[in-house]
UniProtKB/Swiss-Prot annotation:
Name of the protein described by the UniProt record: 2-isopropylmalate synthase
GO MF entries: 2-isopropylmalate synthase activity; acetyl-CoA C-acetyltransferase activity; manganese ion binding
Occurrences of domain Pyruvate carboxyltransferase (ranges): 5-267
An annotated GO cellular component: cytosol
GO BP annotations, alphabetical order: L-leucine biosynthetic process
Catalytic activity: 3-methyl-2-oxobutanoate + acetyl-CoA + H2O = (2S)-2-isopropylmalate + CoA + H(+)
Start and end residues of each stretch annotated as Regulatory domain: 392-522
Requisite cofactors: Mn(2+)
Gene label: leuA
Amino acid sequence: MSDRVIIFDTTLRDGEQALAASLSVKEKLQVALALERLGVDVMEVGFPVSSPGDFESVQTIARHIKNSRVCALSRALEKDIDAAAQALSVAEQFRIHTFISTSNIHVESKLKRSFDQVLDMAVGAVKYARRFTDDVEFSCEDAGRTPIDNLCRMVEAAISAGARTINIPDTVGYTVPSEFGGIIQTLFNRVPNIDQAVISVHCHDDLGLSVANSIAAVQAGARQIECTVNGIGERAGNCSLEEIAMILATRKDMLGLYTNINAREIHRTSSLVSQLCNMPIQPNKAIVGSNAFTHSSGIHQDGMLKAQNTYEIMTPESIGLNRNNLNMTSRSGRHVIKHRMEEMGYGAGDYDMDTLYAAFLKLADKKGQVFDYDLEALAFMEAQAEDDDHYVMEQLVVQSDSTEGKATATVRMRVGDEVITEAATGNGPVDAAYNAIARATHRTINISSYKLGAKGEGQNALGQVDITARYDDRNFHGVGLATDVVEASAQALVHVMNLTWRADKVAYCKQQMQQTRELGGV
C-alpha cells in the first residue's frame, strides 16, 4: 500500500454550497488555479447538471487546469453523468464522481427504494460513467450510518462495476474517530476486491471531528482524503485541507504518510478563499488563523527567544507566511515590489506589474509605508477586475455635515463609453455615495449584508468592505479595498453592479439563443 495520501479538494463544490452568494466563473477559476499551485491531486469543481452556471464553471476550469485532475459530481443518474462528462471533456485529465445514499434512513425516507434496488442503481451508474473515463469515483452517501453488511456489499459491487476510488463519507459528521477508523478497517477485512480501488473518506465537522476522523481513516488504510480550504462547507463545514496537510507533514514520524501539497502555498490559498467567499477566518483557527503563530504568555515568549521550537511545532514560513517586516514606501522601485511578490509566492504571470506598481505608488502616497499584506490586497483587487467592466468609478468626492448627519457625494463614472457625473445626498457618506452611484448607473441594488473589516493592523490598515446584494432573485458578492472606508464601500457596490450587468447580459444572450431555436434556427 502506498504511503502517499491523495488530496481531493472539494472547495468549489461542497465548500461553495455554504456561501450566501455564488462565486463567479472568474472567481472559481482563480480558486482552481490556486489549488493547482497548492498541489492538490484532484479538485472537485462543481455539479454540472445542477445549473448552466455550474456547467460553465466546470468546463472553464477543465480547460485551464493542466496538473491536477478535474472532477465533477453526479447523482447515480445517466443525465447527471452525461452533463459531467460533457463539461469535463476538454480537461487534460478528469474524474467522474457519482454517488447514491446507502444508509437505512436515506434509502427508505429519501429514495423510497429497497437496498437491492439502490445497489443496482449504483452499479449501473458506475458502469455508465466508465463509458467516458477509466477514472470513476463512487460515494456511499451517509456511509457513517449505513449497516456494515450493506456497506461491504455496496463497496464490493461498485468496485466490480469499475469504480477505481470508493469514497466513504461521514455525511452528517456523526461518527467518532475510533468508530470511523473501525469502519474503514472492516472494509479492508471483509471486501475481497478492495485492493482494486483507493479508499477515500469525506468527513463533515458537525461534532468537530472531521479532521480526527480523516486521520483515523488513513491510519486504517484509506489513501484519499476529501477536504476544503479553511474547512468551509455545508453546515459546520468539512475536513480542513490545511490541517490535514500539516498534520501529515508535522507528524510524519508517527504516521509515516505524506501528500503532494506545496505547504508554502497554504497561507496564500487560504487568504484568497476567505476573501472571495466572504468568510473570515477565526483568529484561533489551526494553521491559518491570525493567532496561530502568536505567543502572548511571558513564559512562552521567553522560551521562543531562547529556541523557536520550544513552543512552535511548525514555522510560519512553512505555510508561506513570511516574517519579513520590510516596509516599502513610494521611493521603493519596481525591483523591490517584484522581489516581495516573489517571496510571497507570486509569479510574474499572477499579476500585471504596471498595474500593481501604479496602485502601489498611489497607496504609498496615502499611507507612507506599504506592507506585504497591502501588496497582496492590491494583487487580489487587480485579479477581480474584468476586461469588460461596464461600470468604472473614476472619482468619488464626499462632504459630510457633522451637525445634521447628512452627506453629499459626487461621483464620476464611466458607463460603457460614456462618462457621467452625478451627485446625491444620504444619511451618512456611504449612503450618499451609494445614492450617487445608483443615479449614475440607473441600476438599483438591494444590499442584504454589509461587512466592514481590515487588512493589516492599526492605523495603517486597509479597509475591506464585503457586501451581499439581492438582484433578480440571486445573491451577488462584491468586495472593495481602500485606505478610506467610504471609497472601499463604493468599490464593493461597483463590483456588484458589474456582476449584475454581466448576469443580465448572459440572460439576454440565452434568451436570444432560445428564440433562435424556437424559430428553427432562422
